[in-house]
Amino acid sequence: MIKKIFFLSIIAISCLGLIAEELRPLSWSEKLNHRERFYPVSSGNMEISWDAAEKAVCFDIRFDNGNDFWAYPRLQFKDGESLADVETIQFEYKAVQADEKAGYVCALATFDSGKSILLPNPKNKWQTVTIKVTEVTKEPGKVSYMAIGMNPKSSRLTYWVRNIKMFGNGKASAPVNTAGIVKADVPGMVFTRNEVLEFSLDAYIERPVEWILTDWQGEQLATGEWPENGKGKLSLPRLPDGYYMLKLQSSQVAFTGSRSFVVVPDPDCRRRNPDAFFAVDSAQVWLAGSAGYDAAAEIARRAGLVIVRDRMSWSSCEPERGKYSWGNYLRSVDAFAKRGISVCNTWHDAPDWAKNGNKSIPGDMVAVFRFAQELSRTFKDKVRIWEFWNEQDIGFALDGAWDYAAAMKAAYLGFKAGNPDTLVASGGLSKTDLINYSHVMMQNGLKDYFDIFNLHAYAGITAFPNYLSGIRSYMKRYGISGRRIEFTEVGSVIEGSGRAAGLYGEFKAHSPEQEMLVAEFLPKLMLNMQNLGVDRSFFFVLLPYNEQGGAKDWGLLRRDFSAKPGYAAFSNMMNELGCAELEGTLRLGKDIVGFLYRQPDGTQTVAYWSLSDCDVKSRDAVLNAQGAGKIFFSIPVKEGIYSGTNIFGTPFLAESKSGKLTLQATSMVSYINGLSGLKPVTQFHARKTTGSPIQVDYDRTIVYHVKLSDHFEIAADKDCASVKQDEAAFILEVWNLSDQPKKGRLQISGGKVIGLPGEIFVPPFGKYEVGLHITPKFDGNGNGKICVAGVFNGENTSPLLIPLLSLEKMMKASRTVNFPQMLDPANWRRNASARMEISFDKTEQAVRFLTDFPKTGDCWVYPEYVFQLPQESLRGALGIAFEVKVQEVPAKGFYQMLVMPVLDTQREKGKSFHLRTKAPSAQWEKRYVPLNSGGFNPADIRQIRIGLNWPAGTCCYWLRNAQIIYSR
């Protein structure tokens, strides 16, 4: 991705050049002149198409506001396509932009070798470019991609590229990855039962080739010679559902790897349950590219999905007030709708004109209402669930929990106004232990403004019982026990960072073993969550996606859009259990898990497996070796032949003799069907759920919003505001989100208020605004609150509540204990995702933490201080204070600081709580982190972690002057 050009190593070339007579175009370069070969990379919205008139690939880019305009679509070389035997690269290109007089900053051909070649100034006429490979790199065999693009000076750019040719001697050198050359004309390499299993090879493999078909365990099923020396089409006999692999052999070519494919039931023949528990987060509007919406939606359909999760952007859909442009968002939803798949959709941005003083959460309540109303009206019958925001309790929102609650109220009212039948979900909370932020949300009267309580979790299976216990207690506390519980994101972290090289250089990929781990984990997690009382779970994510600098590989599809084994596992789970009702658990034997389901026809199905790392570990699980974990067990059923399927849907038969059906459990889930008469050992009781009340005994349409002055400072966790002076100013907005005028009086508690008006009038879909001053009332620990309520047209309103903290009053009323022990490196335990050093810095009089992270990966450093009990007990602690600084603030990337109280003494073990604090600068700064804000008792804290999430490279930070503040 090229945003600035001054740092590039640029080599100027002439646009003409003669190809030496002894060189010839390599046959594989013909494959490069297709739009499918280019991956969109730009600072705008890029559409890639084939221009038949020009016989060229066309790139059309619209840029958003700003001046950083660039477009460098990536042409990734596949297996068998190597610059090792290329002497020169030749292509033609031309370009036009919205303002032709504006000109171009530059045009470049870039390579992952780090070199960029300056191209002739773009013109609206064809120019031929020739590049010598020796000017690009000294190791051409290691170049994995090139990009042809430019930096225009106006907001619309269209350019074409054609006749890409690689000239060389044509000698084969690099091994060929089978997955890169075996093709099939089906989306995602996913065949339905009734489709012909037909494959072809890229044209440049023109020599005798042997194919070998295996199952997922590597057992050979068939073999033969590829038709016409690799130039023909290979048709395999019909195969049952399952996950399969094609391998290639040749005496003339070194093939590596395999080409996997999946066989699934015909979607038109599947039973469908619109309320199915099992779902997937597709994210296709962002990850598929508009040209891929239909293909991605068809892959979802073939998995049996009835609902998927997707995204929207308010800023893109309504850049100007009242001017809507649904564009790709509508096209994406339509791609699902025409396949009978409904959508759960979310957005978590706001145009600047709607923020009304907020940093990220919209503060214009009428604007939120109108946009939500237009969404639910426009997408009626296509989008079944609307979520407002995403992970607002962490970095996706920068404003207070009270700001989120106000906007959530407005969104709910708008959604219901546009379509009363739509379901509204609260924004997915990332902190499943429900930190204080989530409590402040509900204390702002949010309970009647959503139908679905929505969470996200990325953890091992063993974490979920505690999660659900806490969630149920939370819901009971706030009177929402009857609401649906849905996890709109759950994903696997047990396999760790990708261990294989990816299709794109900086993106790592799962190894085959890691892919199988995710396949094993997925149904186990889903069934356990269902048994714990979750109402629906969306697995993250269908389409290929990388995070953590490219190290973490997500997606049930690979970067080439082929299905991983996890996709096949999900498809079969959906086919077996998507319409079934969970009855409970079975006791099948030691180390065997069994879940009992009842099918619509009254028969029963048992899902079973043997315990493995996937069941007990939160990360770094190891795939069972073939043959490990196999345990025989019996089920008491009447005599007969019963059918079942393995994890990927491949059928098997089992015979019951003498009233016993003997089966073999492995670490992979299997299903046995057609049973009857079985009783669960632990019965599952489905919760009776209801949505938000249609009517309430107060006025739901009055919504309060506050603009705090700089007399306040919002805490890093966004759950309270500290007050800097005795009398503090703020602006109160009263929004009327109804078509009726409202007259009433305000009620503000929590201190002495100056400027409170008498009776006020709020017009329909309007607001009343007033500036106020408050002298807050604080308790003995320095805690207070602002609470706004009122009575309008004779009805009470939903409240606004802002927790307050006076650090000055808290410190005066508390007892401060210095902790010089934290200066001793020996008292800290190393805990980081890379090698770290802990030392005492005499100059700074501080403990120093130094960690060298790789260029990519999950970079975190959280050294652990274990308290010596009872002398270091935190019983009665109000908070922890310390000074911190970093050697250098990272220029980019995810950067945050957390303080983690932990209820255990072991390294990386025990329940922990993630308390955010402001990320440090390169200067000494003081931090205070409350330890009494809910969720845990400070007396139970056994260790504390104080550290950072870092983008990459060297991380160095210091801590000093640690203090624990206790109540007197």
Language-model segment annotations:
Residues 656-705:
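C-terminal beta-strand-rich structural cap/linker in extracellular carbohydrate-active enzymes
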